Structure formats: C-alpha cells, structure tokens
Amino acid sequence: MNQTISSRAPQKRLAPRLLCVMIGAALGTLSASSWAAAATDSTAENAKKTSATAATAKAEDSKTNDTITVVGAQETFRAGGNDLIPTYLDGQVANGGRIGFLGQQDARNVPFNVIGYTSKMIEDQQANSIADVVKNDASVQNVRGYGNPSQNYRIRGYNLDGDDISFGGLFGVLPRQIVSTSMVERVEVFKGANAFINGISPSGSGVGGMINLEPKRAGDTPLTRVTVDYGSASQVGGALDVGRRYGDDDQFGVRVNVLHREGESAIHDQKERTTAVSTGLDYRGDRARTSLDVGYQKQTIHHMRTDVAIGGATVIPEPPSSTLNYGQSWVYTDMETTFGMLRSEYDVSQNWTVYGSVGASRNEETGQYGAPMLTNNNGDATISRLYVPYVADSVAGLGGIRGHFDTGPITHKVNLGYAANYRTTKSAWNMSGQEDTNIYNPGVIGFPQTVMGSDSQDPQLTSQVRASGLSLSDTLSMMDDKVSLMLGVRRQEVTIRNFDSGVPNSAGSLDAMKVTPIYGIMVKPWEKVSLYANHIEALGPGKSAPYQYNGKPVVNAGQIPGIIHSKQNEIGVKFDNQRYGGTLALFEITRPTGMVDPATNVYGFYGEQRNRGIELNVFGEPVFGTRLLASATWLDPKLTKAADSANNGNDAVGVANYQLVFGGEYDIPVVEGLTATGTVVRSGSQYANEANTLKLKPWTRLDLGVRYTMPMKDTSLTWRANIENVTNERYWESVEDSGTYIYQGDPRALKLSVSMDF
C-alpha cells in the first residue's frame, strides 16, 4: 500500500483552497446585496402571484370539462445564438438545443433530432454525472472505458468518447472521463451524424450523435441554494449555488457553484471523492452579449471496480454479486481539470450578428489500473497492474457571422462559421506481471512489482491533433415558414502527429481534407406537426495500421489511411402542442471500418458497418399533475463488410438491438408539493464479438423516487429520495466496441438530499 502512495503525483491542494476562499468572500458580498433587494423581490413575487391567480380564474371560466390545460408562456428566444431554448412546461426538458456552429435552435424548426435535459431534471433525479442524465434517453447507451472509469456513450449504435463532449459548442474544454453536473444548466443530445455542424472531435468519435453541455447563468430572480446529500454506502456531500444580477437593467450576472462529495459508494470498499468549483459571469446588453466561464474539478476513485476483460472465456459468465468489488485496493485514479470559456456576440445591424468563442483546458490524470482478464468460464482470471500518468492540453475556438435577408417570397438565414480545436497529449507507463484472481472470489493481491515500462516515468509527448473547418449554410424559408430547406457545405481539415515518448513517428502522421455537405427539409402541414428529412455526414481520422496480420507484416504498418467518411439519411415527424410533444425518426448510418486486405496485406477502410433504426421519444404533461418522459430505440446494426467474410450480416459488437426508457412523475393530490417519480430502463441483448458467439443478456432496471417541496417563510425546502436499481439486479450493462471488456451495472443505491433556497 505504501508503494501505491509513493507512485502518485504530488497532491495540489493549495490552489483549490485559495479559490474556495476567494469565492466565499465573493458570496459574502453577494449575500449582503441580496438583502437590499429583498423588498423589491417580494413586490415582484406578489405581482407574479396576482397574475397567476387571474390566469387561473380565466381558465376556470373557459373550461368545458374536468381537464385543466396549462400552457406556459415562453420567454423571448433568439435562435442561432447562445440563449437557451425555453424549457418545456415543468422545466425538466427543452425541445431543442445547440446545433453546432448554428447555435441554439428550436427542434420544431430544424430538420434534426435534438433534445435538452435541464438542471431541474439533474436536481430532481440527483444526477451526479452526465451518464446519470442521458440514461433517460433510449438513443444513448452508457458505455465504460478501457479498464478505467471513463464514461463513454453509444448514440444510434456508434461510440462517443467522454473526451469528445462539447461545452458551449467547443470541443476539448471539459474535464475528461467523468463530468460533474454541478455547473451544468443543460445536457443537450443531438442524435445523428454531425460533421457539418461540429466538425471532427479530438478523438474522432460521435458518428451517431453528440452531447453538448451548457453552463449555468444567473437568472432574473436572485438565487442562494444550499444542498446537503447522502448516497450509499457512506457518501456525504454539500453544494452551494448562488446567482445574482446587477446593473440598472440587470445586465451583469454572476453564478457560482461549489461542490464537495466523498465516501464509500454502493460497491464495497470503493471510495470516491469529487470537488468542483465554477464561476459564470455574463453581460447582456442591447446589442452585445458576452460571458466567461471558469471551472475546476478533481475526482478521485480508490479501490476501483473496473471492467472485466473477456480474455479466454468462451461464454459470457454470470455477473458476480452487484456489490462485490473484484478490483484490488491499489487500483485508483486521480483526475484534475482546470478549464475556461469566453463567448461573445454583437449585433452589427438588425439582421446581422457576429459571434465568437474560445475555450481551453488542462487535464492531469494519474492512476494504477488493473482489470481481471478471464482465463476460463468459471470466473478464473489474471490481473496485472498498469500505471499511466497522462496530461492533455486543449484549446478550441469558433467564430462567424449570421444573418437573414429576403429574395422575393423566400427568406434566407445564412451562417458562415469557422471552428478549430487543438490538443496535445503526454503520457508514460509501467506495468507488472500477472497475478491469479477470480471475479467471484477475488481475494487480496499485494501491490505488484514493475516488470516493464517506458523509458521515462515523466509524461512525454504522445500526440498532437488539430482539426479545423469552414462552414457555410443557407436555410431558405417560404410560405410563412411552413416549408424550409437547409443547404450547406463544410471544408474540414485534420492534422495528426504521433510520437513515441516524445520522438516523432513519421508513419503515424496524417494531413487530410474532406468536403462534407448537408441538405435537409422541414415541412409543417399543420400548426403542431412537422415533417423533416436530412442527409448529413460524419468525419473522423482512422486508426493506425497494425504491424502484423495473421503472422505477416502489414505493408503500411503504423500509418493512418485517412479520414473515415460516414453517411446518414434520416426522415421523421415531430409533434408539439405545448403540453406534450415527441419525435419519431427513421435513419440509416453507414460507416467504413479499418481492416487488412488479406490479398494485399494492406490496411485500409475496406470494412463497413450499417446501422438502421427507429427512434421514438415522448415528453410533456398530457394530464395535469402527470408528466412523462419516455423513449424507445430499435436498431439493426449490421456488419455489411467484416474482416472475416464469414461474419458478414452479423450484428455489430456492443450495440443493443433495442432500448426502452419509460419515466414519469405524479403529483400526489392529497399532499401539496409531494411528487412520486419512477423510471424503467430495458436494454436488449448485445454481442461481444463479430462472430456473434458471445452475447450479453437483456436487462431491466427500475429506479424510484419521491420529493417534497415544503414552502416556508421567505424560503423553500425540498427533500428528495431516490433508489436506483430498486431490485438490485445483477447484469452486464455494456461491452466496449472492440469486444475486449464488459462492464457490470451498478448495485442498488439510495440517494437522499435536502435543498434550501433563500
């Protein structure tokens, strides 16, 4: 155990503490100013209540049955910029989100499938990470990393690395692997290929969709919220969320979030610690709008239960007890990130706006990793230790001009944008030999000694990746916006330089360019119904060629063949009557895959995976006091051109052939402020190899909860209790793309919290 401690990077505690002290001082100033505004706020609140009472009386006069229809009046929304889509009814869902460089868009007005999940949902479900949020969407599979705790995703059957989640439309700014939700206002899921709007992500993932996060902003109403929470088995946390606006017209805003949580998780002996601090400043003038977001996050996991490598198993074994930790005490990870983003836009005229943003981050990670590798079907395995320090520095930018003009009966909405991201990574490694273990009876293994490693244990340069693209779009609207046609083109470049412990690897370099189009159409035959179709593509750099294939040298070993060019066609229908809405979509995405041609022993994009699917999502409040959030995805993921021709027509690795999510809330009438919640998730089977001889069974998980909002004088108190995996199901949740690792679902866990607003 002493060896484990000695191998860690020095702990950096001074900066976060100083930052917390500075924020505390700022909060004291904010609190003092809030007392001065209390009388004004009280008057405004009384006016709101009077208005609401009048509206209710009017509704009573006009109703013809026992059903009460509640339609929320949406606030002013400027499409194309950074203003967030107004929330839907109770505030948990927004029907739209960021469409890359096209900015925030209402889903009813664009030929794409996009939805946003809000901070209210995050709070009500006590969702601590992005994975906790997107589990509400059947189009998204939660997938884990390669022997580490990283949260990856699979959208429409294709992988999205956690490193490739965007922040305000910028890649590479967020913490990697796991992102805390404490500073997040929106989690937006764009479903489908997205090269035209987003370009190439740093890792090249996101063929089937993208996740974007938007930061919290100070609202018009002053906010001071203190939250205390508890989670199984002994995690305790506290959070502070403060927002204020200043100026004659409330043009200046400040939002501060502070979080700390630590303790043992529901998995035995696995201890987790999270610290996150963020500050968001913004200015909203008549013509200029700007914002600055800075943040710090540190996450530590000790005695971590990682994935299980399939290894020599010929069948997928039954999962162990859901709480059993088959990791070892020396397995840990420490991840620390400092990041920031600056965004601005300026209206040069009534019809034209220039915009720009820039962001950067530094990620530092160190850890001792060890995942059991099965040697037979009885749970026997071997485990070895891998030490990997890792450093990544990223910077990204976006700029352009958007506007609109008319040519006769046609309105043109034009956007010209340029985006770029650049990332450098450094790493080192050492590893031990193998030790025997068993996933059902892991025992205790001492810290294994190093037997091999890189020349230097200080992280050395391993890669440099730069991606940039110039995009032009024109959305033509006619017939009072009942018909719109989106046309666009993007010129995308990518440059990759790989290194071997700081030494350039000329074979692993790439300089490539692709031009990718977009065309989509939206037709509104009725006020509440929209029909749409699109063709859009995805781009990403391929992997380096292997050095050997079937015991023979590969001709272009180590080389990157070029850019993988995937294509999507989609049609769908959307419905929205401001009480409830939804989308039904049918799509096909084809993606080339890398493989060695047996005839020439040359590596190239000779393979192909084709995913065809149907998506359905429904949200809203069809009956007053009853809210629904449900979705379903059916996929036919086929290997149309496999490395082994005998596998042609088989299902792709790791893609569940269906996933169903049914969530709901019910306001209990007899107790004002009391709400019962529940979510059922059903996932279909997944194959763990291309031969389709290894298969993960379908699984079902039930989550239940209750919350109670207790009004108090000048404050409100909200109690929340959630139980995840109520029946404590044992199941293998997912398998990663190569079929190497399977990951076990989390055990039953209790979450409790109380929040006070004052």
Curated annotation (Swiss-Prot):
Motif position, TonB C-terminal box: 741-758
Segment forming the signal sequence: 1-36
Keyword Membrane: yes
Gene3D superfamilies found in the cross-reference section: TonB-dependent receptor, beta-barrel domain (2.40.170.20), TonB-dependent receptor, plug domain (2.170.130.10)
Membrane topology value: Multi-pass membrane protein
Pfam families: Plug, TonB_dep_Rec_b-barrel
Localisation: Cell outer membrane
InterPro entries: Plug_dom, Plug_dom_sf, TonB-dep_rcpt-like, TonB-dep_rcpt_b-brl, TonB_box_CS, TonB_rcpt_b-brl_sf, TonB_rcpt_CS, TonB_sidphr_rcpt
Domain TBDR plug: 106-216
SUPFAM superfamilies reported in the protein's UniProt record: Porins
Induction notes from the record: By iron starvation. Iron regulation mediated through the Fur protein.
Domain (TBDR beta-barrel): residue spans on this chain: 221-758
Assigned GO CC terms: cell outer membrane
One Gene Ontology term of the molecular function aspect: signaling receptor activity
Segments carrying motif TonB box: 66-73
Keywords associated with the record: Cell outer membrane, Ion transport, Iron, Iron transport, Membrane, Receptor, Signal, TonB box, Transmembrane, Transmembrane beta strand, Transport
Assigned protein family: Belongs to the TonB-dependent receptor family.
NCBIfam families: TonB-siderophor
Function: Receptor for the hydroxamate siderophore, ferrichrome. Binds also to most other ferrichrome derivatives except enantio ferrichrome and ferric rhodotorulate.
PANTHER family documented for this protein: FCUA PROTEIN, FERRICHROME IRON RECEPTOR-RELATED
Name of the featured protein: Ferrichrome receptor FcuA
Species, as recorded: Yersinia enterocolitica
